[in-house]
Amino acid sequence: MKSLTSFVINEASSEIIDKMKNALKEELNAWYGYIIVKEWLEGTDRKDIEKFYEDTAKDELEDHGYWLMKRINQLGGTIEDITISPNSWKDANHKYISPTWKNGNIDIKKSIEDNIINEEGAIETYRELVKLTDGVDPASNSKLKKILADEEEHLQELKDFLEDIK
């Protein structure tokens, strides 16, 4: 017979894994969006925004996404459905917003506005995960707080860029 403690932990682990899988989809969507805009900004006079998009794409994939993949596996989840088929990314709670084009070029103002929406969604997701892992999974909770801080920093930088180009 299972103890109540192990049942609660298992239930919490299942919910944590599901939320982490959603966060992974959001991170992959974010990486894709940032890298596309970065490539289209290459050669423009906004090297600062191009550098932000390049660095943020790396954060989303190499730090956040990779950690989520490892942690989901460590907790007993699987990621094959997410990593093998980018079509599964569209099931994320916060959807990818594709870059907006204007006269054959990226509309940088609109792209920044869209990325602000994406970062706000990521912040919401990570706040939920931080709350969910608090007192249940200290290792995940610590890293999730760091990722949340990164997402809040990304949001502020995007808002600063938006203010600068208005």
Residue spans for each PLM region:
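Conserved alpha-helical segments that form or flank metal/cofactor-binding pockets of metalloenzymes
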Residues: 37-89, 158-162
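Acidic/histidine-rich alpha-helical segments that form the ligand environment
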Residues: 19-26, 30-33, 37, 66-71, ...
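A structural signal for alpha-helical segments
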Residues: 15, 44-55, 107, 139-146
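Proteolytic processing junctions in secreted/extracellular precursors
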Residues: 2-11
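Vicinal oxygen chelate
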Residues: 153-157
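Structured surface interface patches that mediate subunit assembly and partner/cofactor docking
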Residues: 150, 164-166
